[in-house]
Amino acid sequence: LTYYRSLDELPPFDDYDITKGRTYKYFKGDVLYPFGYGLSYTTFKYSNLQVADGEEEINVSFQLKNAGKYAGDEVAQVYVKLPERDEVMPVKQLKGFERVTLKSGENKKVTLKLRKDLLRYWDEAKDKFVCPSGDYTIIVGASSADIRLQKVVSVLQKDNYPMSHSEK
């Protein structure tokens, strides 16, 4: 859930076009509480982002360290920015997350697998889902606004990924 600083930042209530900034995916301003925001009694450091392009998925791994004095939980989030296109595209989309519990000073390697078929989007002109090849930005952080790591990776996609179970 995203809390905007002002109602003036939202499109009219009867305008359901999300590309006009209705969600964190398209909103470009500063918000009061960004999507994924949380509080903690400790601090976490992210490092060593590794991204590997596989045939059916993209493997994202990074180190997460509890740099504070207390044990705590962190919900590490992975967002993806799609390659630049002519049509309106999301600023970023949440594609994975993991809740990690760490003791003070503890370090852990976090690995998330992002299925390539979930990177597709609906192309209005083609009237179908497409998975464009190109430069994807992999974004890792504590919320949609608290970005700690990012890396651009060239991804080879195909348009014929099987549909997920929920779409059959």
Describe the predicted segments one by one:
Residues K113-S144:
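Short, surface-exposed ligand- or partner-binding patches at beta-edge/loop junctions that are enriched
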Residues A71-V78, P90, W122-A125:
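Short, hydrophobic/aromatic beta-strand segments
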